Amino acid sequence: MKLRNLFLLIALSLPVCLSAQTSKQIYLQRADSLLQQILTLYKVEKYGLLTETYPRKPEQRITYTANTGVVVNQQEVSFLWPYSALVSGCVSLYKVSGQKKYRKLMDRQIKPGLDLYWDSTRIPHCYQSYPAFAGHNDRYYDDNDWVAIDFCDYYERTGDKEYLEKAIQLHDYIYSGWSEELGGGIYWCEQKKESKNTCSNAPATVLCMKLFKLTKDAKYLEQAKKTYQWTRDNLCDPSDFVYWDNKNLQGKVDPAKYTYNSGQMIQAGVLLYQATGEKRYLKEAQQTAEGSCRFFLKVQPIAIGEMKFFPGTSWFNVILFRGLKALYLVDRNEAYIKTMIENVDYAWNYTRDENGLFSNDWSGHREEQFKSLLENACMIELFAEISELQFKHNKQ
């Protein structure tokens, strides 16, 4: 056996007994080091934004245009979606650590960068998929979901009303995408109203629940219930309680399944249970958690044998983790959440490149030359959120 494999055997077979404080520090250090590396490697000095990949793909082009979808320009900076993963990471780091440097970074650098994506020329106002300096681009309801959720979390920690007001404004934009076609539901893209997607409706439910908690306005709770039920009735596979991707306006379901869709419905169910006390929401969250782990976890070979891994879709998996963590904090079932933690511990220890960056595949079987901002920035949130959890042992 090679020496490296021997070390791997030791690392994976022996539980590392650590104090909760030590474990928290380890995960926070991982999150912080990745944050600093991303801000350095992906930086676009001209705009104060970040590139889509590192190294930058020379052929990268803007494809999300508001009218035709035709490539119009070379892509200088990332789309909103990857940039929002950085927002999520910074919010999580500040939320769990309380360190002022993260609030300073958010308020003085990351939020001003995010503002460059703001479209103030079309009503309702919202964030568009590419910075406004490049003209009009597509506006996605789910892109705005993720940002609004982050703003709710940040407001809850800081008390800065600017973020709550912006979250409410984004909520109003998102629900402008609700229509009675298919009996309800929110479209995916404002410029392509062709389908109602789990990825626009499930996080909208989570957003409504967060706004209900922050404002005590019952309209958000009722809206959350309605959106949750529409999504469950139309997009939940009754055979395993895992969520399909979308339903088009002809009523045809796209049966593709992605971890983040189920993750947001798990989180939505937990939040509804906590607010209403209705046990069916908790039961449905537990059913989807169990079904998701059965469906998505696949055995992969590693140097010393085999290990179960979630798919090679890091950001999607992080959104699943949001749901699994919310569920764990209620029912204290460690099984699902610890599998994800073991995955990312393995990825940290054995699959990063010379710059400390990740490919999509946590098992390390598929290496990528161009490291995605989306798939790396999301890991900041994941490590920060793991740092709050206390188990008897973690394999780090």
Please place each PLM-identified region on the residue numbering.
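Oxyanion-binding "anion nests"
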Residues: 258-297
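Active-site cradle of extracellular carbohydrate-active enzymes
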Residues: 198-204, 208-212, 220-269
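The canonical alpha-helical register within tetratricopeptide repeats
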Residues: 37, 108, 112, 169-173, ...
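CBM-like carbohydrate-recognition segments
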Residues: 23-84, 96, 101, 112-142, ...
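Well-ordered alpha-helical scaffold segments within catalytic/enzyme domains
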Residues: 84-100, 146-160, 203-217, 264-278, ...
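Surface-exposed cleft-lining segments at the edges of enzyme active sites
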Residues: 188-193, 215, 247-255, 276
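Extended ligand-binding groove/face enriched in aromatic
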Residues: 100-211, 218-225
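Bacterial Sec-dependent N-terminal signal peptides
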Residues: 1-23
